[in-house]
């Protein structure tokens, strides 16, 4: 996995940095593991905009990725290909299990075509293998972690991220999240060893607005150039906001805590990400 830089032959290429896709071994997805994906353009089931500045973009097929690795316990699988997935920042790996079933998983760093992976309590500690946290040594780097046993992987699934297993106490393991938060997770929860691949994603630069439009992202209009009816920053003579920066719905934009009150899971947070 590397990055491509371009000579400034056009304004759009001057600062463009994109992946070279050298790790991709297959361009067409496995037909049995894709389903149609309908565009929402940022609208919910009422047709109202819930995410602004979304719409258009290239057609996509959704790749069904296996986040429930415990379903194939103790069945070895061979990596058939590493593929691009337009629906996420990470790459995906196509596995062919010994029983003939095919599944996609997130491709961790160091996983190559021809490698064998396994899930289960007895699996070896190597990238791509999935085990319960109770069977993983302290200090190991892991990703695709479940919040609840048999709940499916929810934590650390983006390109280049991982958690570190810091300790085990009773029925809980202490994990250091990518954000720096220390959190307790039940030791029966499954996690996959290694760091999610495509680590250079954070260094990519689109270079031009059109590349963002291909992804379905529309121009992000500033509130200060809107009318008063559309945004608290709108209107007025000149460009002054007139008051504290805030969202279109009046929520302060700087230094305001937006996490809603107490919740049952608070007891599992040992240290917040901001200390």
Swiss-Prot record:
<dbReference type="InterPro" id="IPR002171">
    <property type="entry name" value="Ribosomal_uL2"/>
</dbReference>
<comment type="subunit">
    <text>Part of the 50S ribosomal subunit. Forms a bridge to the 30S subunit in the 70S ribosome.</text>
</comment>
<dbReference type="InterPro" id="IPR012340">
    <property type="entry name" value="NA-bd_OB-fold"/>
</dbReference>
<dbReference type="InterPro" id="IPR008991">
    <property type="entry name" value="Translation_prot_SH3-like_sf"/>
</dbReference>
<dbReference type="InterPro" id="IPR022669">
    <property type="entry name" value="Ribosomal_uL2_C"/>
</dbReference>
<keyword id="KW-0689">Ribosomal protein</keyword>
<dbReference type="Pfam" id="PF03947">
    <property type="entry name" value="Ribosomal_L2_C"/>
</dbReference>
<dbReference type="InterPro" id="IPR005880">
    <property type="entry name" value="Ribosomal_uL2_bac/org-type"/>
</dbReference>
<feature type="region of interest" description="Disordered">
    <location>
        <begin position="223"/>
        <end position="275"/>
    </location>
</feature>
<dbReference type="InterPro" id="IPR022671">
    <property type="entry name" value="Ribosomal_uL2_CS"/>
</dbReference>
<keyword id="KW-0687">Ribonucleoprotein</keyword>
<dbReference type="GO" id="GO:0016740">
    <property type="term" value="F:transferase activity"/>
</dbReference>
<dbReference type="GO" id="GO:0019843">
    <property type="term" value="F:rRNA binding"/>
</dbReference>
<dbReference type="Pfam" id="PF00181">
    <property type="entry name" value="Ribosomal_L2"/>
</dbReference>
<dbReference type="GO" id="GO:0015934">
    <property type="term" value="C:large ribosomal subunit"/>
</dbReference>
<dbReference type="GO" id="GO:0003735">
    <property type="term" value="F:structural constituent of ribosome"/>
</dbReference>
<dbReference type="InterPro" id="IPR014722">
    <property type="entry name" value="Rib_uL2_dom2"/>
</dbReference>
<comment type="function">
    <text>One of the primary rRNA binding proteins. Required for association of the 30S and 50S subunits to form the 70S ribosome, for tRNA binding and peptide bond formation. It has been suggested to have peptidyltransferase activity; this is somewhat controversial. Makes several contacts with the 16S rRNA in the 70S ribosome.</text>
</comment>
<keyword id="KW-0694">RNA-binding</keyword>
<keyword id="KW-0699">rRNA-binding</keyword>
<dbReference type="GO" id="GO:0002181">
    <property type="term" value="P:cytoplasmic translation"/>
</dbReference>
<protein>
    <recommendedName>
        <fullName>Large ribosomal subunit protein uL2</fullName>
    </recommendedName>
</protein>
<feature type="compositionally biased region" description="Basic and acidic residues">
    <location>
        <begin position="230"/>
        <end position="240"/>
    </location>
</feature>
<dbReference type="InterPro" id="IPR014726">
    <property type="entry name" value="Ribosomal_uL2_dom3"/>
</dbReference>
<dbReference type="InterPro" id="IPR022666">
    <property type="entry name" value="Ribosomal_uL2_RNA-bd_dom"/>
</dbReference>
<comment type="similarity">
    <text>Belongs to the universal ribosomal protein uL2 family.</text>
</comment>
């Amino acid at each position: 996995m590397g990055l491509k830089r371009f000579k400034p032959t056009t304004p759009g290429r001057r600062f463009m940095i994109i992946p070279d896709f050298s790790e991709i071994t297959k361009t067409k997805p496995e037909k049995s593991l894709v389903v149609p994906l309908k565009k929402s353009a940022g609208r919910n089931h009422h047709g109202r905009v819930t995410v602004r500045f979304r719409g258009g973009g290239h057609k996509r097929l959704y790749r069904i990725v296996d986040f429930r690795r415990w379903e194939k316990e103790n069945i070895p699988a061979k990596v058939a290909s590493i593929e691009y997935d337009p629906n996420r920042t990470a790459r995906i790996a196509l596995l062919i299990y010994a029983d003939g079933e095919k599944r996609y998983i997130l491709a961790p760093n160091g996983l190559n075509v021809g490698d064998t992976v396994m899930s289960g309590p007895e699996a070896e500690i190597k990238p791509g293998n999935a085990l319960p946290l109770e069977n993983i040594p302290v200090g190991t780097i892991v990703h695709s972690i479940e919040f609840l046993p048999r709940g499916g992987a929810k934590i650390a699934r983006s390109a280049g991220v991982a958690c570190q297993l810091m300790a085990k106490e009773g029925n809980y393991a202490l994990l250091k999240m990518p954000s720096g938060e220390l959190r307790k997770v039940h030791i029966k929860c499954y996690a996959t060893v290694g760091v999610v691949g495509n680590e250079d994603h954070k260094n990519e630069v689109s270079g031009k607005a059109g590349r963002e439009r291909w992804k379905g992202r529309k121009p992000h209009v500033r509130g200060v150039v809107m009318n008063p009816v559309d945004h608290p920053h709108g209107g007025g003579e000149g460009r002054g906001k007139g008051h504290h920066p805030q969202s279109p719905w009046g929520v302060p934009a700087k230094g305001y805590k937006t996490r809603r009150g107490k919740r049952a899971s608070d007891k599992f947070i040992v240290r917040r990400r901001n200390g």
